[in-house]
Amino acid sequence: MAALCEAFTLCGLGPAGGVGLGSGLLALEPGADPDHVLLTDRGRTTTLFKVSDQKPLGCWSVKHGQIITCPVVCNFETHEYIAVHDNKVLRIWKDEDVNLDKVFKATLSAEVYRIHSLPHAEPLVLFKGGGVRTLDVLLEAPQQEIENVISDEVIKWSEAFLESRQPVLIFVTEKDGDFFVYVQKPKMRSLHKYKLEQQELCNPLSFTAYIKKQIITLLCLYSSDSVYKVLIPLQQSSEEEEQTSSKSLLLNLSISGSVLKGTSFVVLDKDHVAVLGSLAASGEESKECLTIWNTKFQTLQASKELPLGTSGQLWCYGEKFFFTHGKVLTVVIYKCETSSLAAAVGKLKDSQTSDLSSFVNWNTLGDEELLVSLQSQQSVALKSESKMTLRSKKSAVANIQPDTSTVGQFLLSIKDASTAAVEDQLRQLLSKAQMPDFQATIGCIISALINRCKTDPKFYPRNFLVQMIQKGELSYSLCPDLMAVALEKKDVHLLQICLQRFPDIPEEITYACLKVFLSISDDYLERTDVNLESVISYIDIEPNNKEVKTEVVENGFNTELEEDGCDVTGMKETHMMDSVEFCPVGPQKAALLNAVLHSAYSETFLLPHLKDLPAQQAVLFLRYLHYLYVKCSEKINTTLPGILSPTISQIMDWMCLLLDAHFTVMVMLPEAKGLLSSMHRFVRAQVRLYSELNKIEGSLQELQRIKCQKHSQAYSIEVLELI
């Protein structure tokens, strides 16, 4: 038996990764770790993802004007990544590499169709002319001549396997409506060609294959809504140039009058295949869906509708399906069990439900589905208890049941209730002493509230949302639409708390928060509830008070001094000028910007978004960062007072990011030139300061070393005067 289990979103897709054939991704390949996948888009970027965390680990792009023409793969032996751009240019790099322009490059003599990576073997490079080379042989002479095996044929599909520790490559070509299968063993220099038996009025759409006992089983998905099987033996005694291979019907994709128009499929085991396509019944509109079929019993065993549409691509790694759904890449966990008549009728002995980690995407469920999901999770939790439950534990479990029904009633009642009524019910609900799986329950409730907020603009239980975030029970992945709604309503206080509490906010959302904070006027923010704990201890709130002095210890040089001069009086005067330099933004906006500085990010993913920041906002943000840097430098320990105040490392990192994104624009802006010049002088003075401190430290260490030297063959008489 087979079943589709939990589904979750791995990542969003760009404009080219949408719905429809010809769109989507270039490919999805496994990474060095079983939990890693390599995503290559139809442009110039590839991204490494950790599936269980739903977070990117690295992203690499070729230059503008170049395009990746071959899916990026991982060399399982060296843990290096291999890509081909512009058909002939080979690139090889490692995790720590950032700029692909600086990694290994080789220009080949022929165009590459695909690179296949195999465990415990060198990757195989398949050229568009049908020639094959192992990567090590190819790198010895990148410009070596590649033979043209196929004439006027176009490769449609390819796959590589290891059989008896020998690599085997199989690829399918097409010419004038005829399809051919090539089986090649690169190390044995053997190549066999087969012609697929033609099928009237239909053509193969997709291929997949596997090897077992020296026999290749090639499965072909035809436009006649059928899957055919072709058996090709690896051991061939015949030396014929071309042989015709017969096929046999494996599966008809029809059930109860409905026909599945498949676009792609994968083999799960010897009895199961998964097919992605459109299920159409007579007189009804077709629906795209993911299905699992049992080839042994010719039955449909699992199906999942995909209302947002797909690109027709399907991948399967580690008991997980990967496919595009709308504008996101979706992951669906599945399970397959041994096919038998006993299992089909539920009479298989010792059958147990496998333990699967729960991945619930609360955002995609409606209120009724949320309730069913919540109840199913709680029932699983209760069933997992030992069968030898004590009476006391049974009574405790019994006490939990009313809470479940209470949560369910609440989810069904919030559709029409007012904000005040909903918040009152929530306070009563959360006051319960016991609540099973508290975090999942809260995630379910938050998602239901957000769904109501989307449909009813007047409904917004802000107080409850703030309370739940402050308790630390939520994360961005648990309620991904929460911050989107807060951004739409410009609820800066809620966004501030999310930035401080959520550890997994995507860089796109962090940038959106920064842009909103910079665009809102200080006058508006003065009427807004914002937590000022991160700024109240150091910011200059009274701009008219010119006598404000901060408790600092001077550690900076006069920025106006010459390189070889040092005037203490000038230093003090300059320091007095710096100490009364006022913050370029109000305290409320400063507190919000501090929350952005505290959020976790990856420079690779944040920098493209920062480049879209308007120039005036970028200058204002840079002025504030400069102000913070000056304030930090005034302190002997270079730390700002207050709770959740930004560190000097965070300030410097953001300054570098902002300058990387906008340096050319800022150099051209008149209002930014003075700021850049001031920053340059200040940083130069700091560098000179630390240079002098390093010299002093070196001198002290040398004095300490001389003082500690012992002369074993000498003696001295010391006279000590006691006072």
Curated annotation (Swiss-Prot):
It is found in: Nucleus, Nucleolus. Coiled coil: none annotated. GO terms for biological process: maturation of SSU-rRNA; positive regulation of transcription of nucleolar large rRNA by RNA polymerase I. Pfam families: Nol11_C (PF20998), NOL11_N (PF08168). InterPro entries: NOL11 (IPR042859), Nol11_C (IPR048897), NOL11_N (IPR012584). One of its GO terms (cellular component) is nucleolus. The keyword Transcription applies. It comes from the Eukaryota. Keywords: Activator, Nucleus, Ribosome biogenesis, rRNA processing, Transcription, Transcription regulation. Ribosome biogenesis factor. May be required for both optimal rDNA transcription and pre-rRNA processing. This is Nucleolar protein 11. The gene is NOL11.
